Amino acid sequence: MYMIESKGGAIACMLLALLFLGTWPAIMTLTERRGRLPQHTYLDYTLTNLLAAVIIALTLGEIGPSRPNFFTQLSQDNWQSVMFAMAGGIVLSLGNLATQYAWAYVGLSVTEVITASITVVIGTTLNYFLDDRINRAEVLFPGVACFLIAVCFGSAVHKSNAADNKTKLQNFKSLETTSSFEMETISASNGLTKGKAKEGTAAFLIELEKQRAIKVFGKSTIIGLVITFFAGICFSLFSPAFNLATNDQWHTLKHGVPKLNVYTAFFYFSISAFVVALILNIRFLYWPILGLPRSSFKAYLNDWNGRGWSFLAGFLCGFGNGLQFMGGQAAGYAAADAVQALPLVSTFWGILLFGEYRRSSRKTYTLLISMLLMFIVAVAVLMASSGHRK
């Protein structure tokens, strides 16, 4: 198998993982905003997410002089470590599934900020102690502090932007009570031209609500925040579980049995994530949640609208997780949690693709820039804390 042995190689893995893991949520959000049911999107996503793990295992897990290889470990008595890997896959799958609904309620940027902050506070601390403190604490924990400051800015951005949107929509009493003639008149005065609303206007927000799969107007953001915090707790546990699977800090393996390599662990990790996602999403097809329309497995198979984007999201997430674990195995999983600065990438895509924060107030822009700058500092500091596993 191929092993990352240099600090530079580990950091390169983390940076690439950061790009991939910050991009796939934007793609999933794009399909939902275009009206595709999240159950359909997630079923497609989970197929290629598993395929990415298989590709990594059959290539990087088999090449190179390091032993044992992927196929060798499949027959070894290492079920204890396999259970840790599969537990990590289960909580990650639950977290990813939850965030798919949270994005609609509280937005892509804020969802990623909150879940990332919980992951850093809980997950990075657990990984630091599990890794026998190979990361430099005097650098690592100031990085965590920078992350928390960025989270505070992120919360302020959400509050300020929500106030901006409320101001934009103040001429609209409700979608249900506004006549079609009034809607056309008001929309025209708020940026709707030739059937296409300008990003950041009240007309744009209304047009988006009509088109998207998950309807959010008139619903409390508390629902979204609860889902988001649940996802954050799940995300904070999957990396420590994977850490235990590959390094056996609790000495659960029998004497002489090799520890799981990162590729074998990632394979089992992805298998459990796939099974959980498959079971839950097939259930959600027939018994949907949050007011979504009912679907069926036949309808899913016939729904090709956005399928390519969903497949791409699965590949990006799968390869992103694999790169994160490869970097973590080499430089410490606490340092690899620097990929939780993925809101940097998600916010970029949110602004570029979805017009988030367009036509917002100067206060919102100031807070947004402050959040992004603090995230940049946080990811740099966490990567600087990288150690080297002996």
UniProtKB/Swiss-Prot annotation:
Question: Where mainly located?
Answer: membrane
**How does this protein sit in the membrane?**
Multi-pass membrane protein
| Cell location | Membrane
Tagged with keyword Nucleotide-binding: yes
Write out the topological domains of type Extracellular. 1-9, 66-78, 123-136, 243-261, 329-333, 385-390
What does the entry list under GO cellular component? membrane
> Sorted alphabetically, which Pfam families does this protein's record hold?
Ureide_permease (PF07168)
Tissue expression from the record:
Expressed in leaves, flowers, roots and stems.
Q: What induces it?
A: By nitrogen deficiency.
Topological region Cytoplasmic: 31-44, 100-101, 158-221, 283-307, 355-363
Q: Which terms under GO biological process does the entry name?
A: allantoin transport; pyrimidine nucleobase salvage; uracil transport
Q: Which residues bind ATP?
A: A213, I214, K215, V216, F217, G218, K219, S220
Any one Gene Ontology MF annotation carried by this entry is: allantoin:proton symporter activity
Q: Tell me how activity varies with pH.
A: Optimum pH is 4.75.
- Bilayer-crossing residues are 10-30, 45-65, 79-99, 102-122, 137-157, 222-242, 262-282, 308-328, 334-354, 364-384
| Family of the protein in this entry | Belongs to the plant ureide permease (TC 2.A.7.19) family.
Name this polypeptide is given: Ureide permease 1
